[in-house]
From Swiss-Prot:
Name used for this protein in its record: Type 3 secretion system secretin
UniProt source species: Ralstonia nicotianae (strain ATCC BAA-1114 / GMI1000) (Ralstonia solanacearum)
Entry superkingdom: Bacteria
Bridged cysteine pairs (disulfide): none
Family label: Belongs to the bacterial secretin family. T3SS SctC subfamily.
């Protein structure tokens, strides 16, 4: 052992270098005890020293060299070993050298080796032997080195044991849904995927679903309606009169970003379906994730060292969504009035005012408008009028209210009507549904029984908003799906014919702007009979005393959709 220590002291490389205060050490000794000499060395260099009582010898001579070279000269001459642990320089005799074998149960030898090197404990003068197959470490050297290596190895091994220990944690959610939700809209199944189901799908534990495959984002139903048999006769009749008494405008399924399959969860997979990652121990199993609907929490059973990753992911999914107000106006304008409105068409938003006209009609005044076009009415009065051409001017405030003001003016002469003006609050990336339909049932005879076949007609407006932050500007992206239809007077086999029109569009607008959708016409017919009582019912000649009059109007239907952020 003494010979080995002499070989160890020959080198000067250590993981934690001694912080010498100077590069020159001058010293003169005459039969001075080696322990006092080493204390003088440490005191002059401001290095704490701990010298074993078993270190013996006397020093005589004059020395002028670096502190490190002087220490190595003394170690080689008197046969002691020194070790610096980062705080104290420890000097021990060769008889105090120790050797230890450390067995690891959980941690790997590579983990211990990296920790010793990173902490500055390993010293190249005292090589440490590692055996990966048996998980063993052999260390020999000064007592302090052996003690530190043993302590660090035990801490790492115990930490790995604690990390591999299976624990169960509950993560309560504040905004997202933990469980899957199923709702029915127009006879079709809507699946809203919860956080627990999303996590299960990431770890390969997506359980079977009782509703089939979830719809894709580009599907017609705007991420909400699962594929299935379409409801019969989805046509349309009258427009939306109000929100009261109809279906709930919002599906109770939660936020729109969690769309997918639902149903019972499958047990954790094994074998090739297990999660593999370079950062996770291959001996670990796939986590078990369940949802607690009572507390709206996600329960995770997994190793303790993975819980931090689960918590970070769940917190990112449980983000606070913005609250938006979707205001929709369904407007019917007669074609004659639409031509007039087209002449005096005025488009507004928060930044510009574009107006065209023939200069004869009264202009909608806006206090914030910068234009002051006027036309002479009579001989004395000057009134604001529409310009004879396109004029670009700035407007303070929103733009949709000016169009609504002109529509309200047309209502006075029965040339326009606002058939519905619903408002609904919804969450960011959650579809808002405004639906008003008429349903009637047609009996269909079967072999042993008769069934009722449902036919629905009406107006359905679905808006899926998403708040987009573009620098400091708030923009709103909308997916809009409109179904508008009516029951016609024509019949086939004593059944009325329904007509239906659909509109699918997307738009990215600034907050406060409106999206105007138009182009479909609606017919309104009325019949009146003027007759002479009694005489009009005489056979053959009764028609001479009766007048039948049928009048009809064609309306152009417009949809004005205005989103607004209530709570960002």
């Amino acid at each position: 052992m003494a010979a080995a220590l002499l070989l160890w002291t020959a080198g000067t490389v250590c993981a934690a270098p001694i912080p010498w205060q100077s590069q020159k050490f001058e010293y003169v000794a005459d039969r001075k005890d080696i322990k006092e000499v080493l204390r003088d060395l440490g005191a002059s260099q401001h290095v704490m020293t701990s010298i074993s009582t078993q270190v013996e010898g006397s020093v005589t001579g004059s020395f002028n060299e670096t502190p490190q070279k002087f220490l190595d000269r003394m170690a080689g001459t008197f046969g002691f070993a020194w070790y610096y642990d980062g705080a104290v320089l420890r000097v021990t005799s060769a008889n105090e050298a120790q050797s230890a074998t450390i067995a690891l149960t959980r941690a790997s030898t590579a983990q211990v080796k990296r920790a010793l090197t990173r902490m500055g404990i390993a010293d190249s003068r005292f090589p440490i032997q590692y055996d990966d197959d048996s998980g063993s470490i052999v260390v020999s050297g000064p007592p302090r080195l052996v003690e530190l290596v043993r302590d660090i190895a035990q801490v790492i091994d115990r930490g790995r044991e604690d990390a591999n220990r299976t624990v169960v944690r509950a993560f309560p959610l504040r905004y997202a849904w933990a469980t899957d939700h199923r709702v029915t809209v127009n006879g079709q199944s809507v699946n809203i995927r919860g956080v627990a189901s999303i996590l299960n799908s990431m770890y390969g534990g997506d359980g079977p679903s009782d509703s089939g495959t979830a719809p894709r984002a580009q599907d017609r139903r705007l991420d909400s309606v699962a594929p299935g048999e379409a409801s019969a006769g989805r046509a349309g009749t009258r427009a939306l009169s109000s929100l009261g008494g109809g279906k709930s405008p919002l599906p109770p399924g939660g936020t729109g970003q969690y769309v997918g399959n639902s149903g019972p969860y499958a047990p954790p997979p094994s074998g090739e379906n297990r999660l593999r990652s370079d950062e996770l121990d291959d001996r670990g199993s796939t986590p078990i994730i369940r949802a607690d609907p009572r507390s709206n929490s996600v329960l995770v059973r997994d190793r303790a060292d993975r819980m931090a990753a689960h918590q970070s992911l769940i917190e990112s999914l449980d983000s606070r969504p913005a609250v938006l107000e979707i205001s929709a106006s369904i407007i019917d304008i007669s074609e004659n009035a639409l031509e007039q409105l087209g002449v005096d068409w005025r488009l507004h938003n928060s930044r510009f005012d574009l107006q065209t006209g023939n200069g004869t009609n009264t202009m909608l005044n806006n206090p914030g408008s910068l234009d002051s076009v006027a036309t002479t009415a009579g001989a004395a009065a000057a009134i604001a009028a529409t310009p004879a051409g396109g004029v670009l001017s700035a407007v303070i405030g929103g733009g949709s209210r000016y169009l609504m003001a002109r529509i309200s003016a047309l209502q006075q002469t029965d040339q326009a009507r606002i058939t519905a003006n619903p408002k609904v609050a919804t969450l960011d990336n959650t579809e808002a549904v405004m639906d008003n339909r008429q349903n009637f049932y047609v009996p269909v005879a079967g072999y042993q029984s008769a069934d009722l076949y449902a036919i629905s007609a009406g107006v359905s407006l679905r808006v899926l908003p998403m708040v987009v932050m573009d620098g400091g500007t708030v923009r709103i992206r909308m997916n809009v799906h409109i179904e508008d239809g009516q029951i016609t007077s024509q019949q086939v086999g004593n059944l009325p014919i329904t007509s239906q029109s659909e509109i699918d569009t997307q738009a990215l607008i600034n907050e406060g702007d409106s999206l105007l959708i138009a182009g479909y016409s609606v017919e309104q017919q009325s019949k009146s009979v003027d007759a002479v009582p009694g005489l009009s019912k005489i056979p053959l000649v009764g028609a001479l005393f009766r007048t039948d009059q049928t009048t009809g109007k064609r309306f152009q239907r417009m949809f004005l959709v205005t989103p607004r952020v209530i709570t960002p």
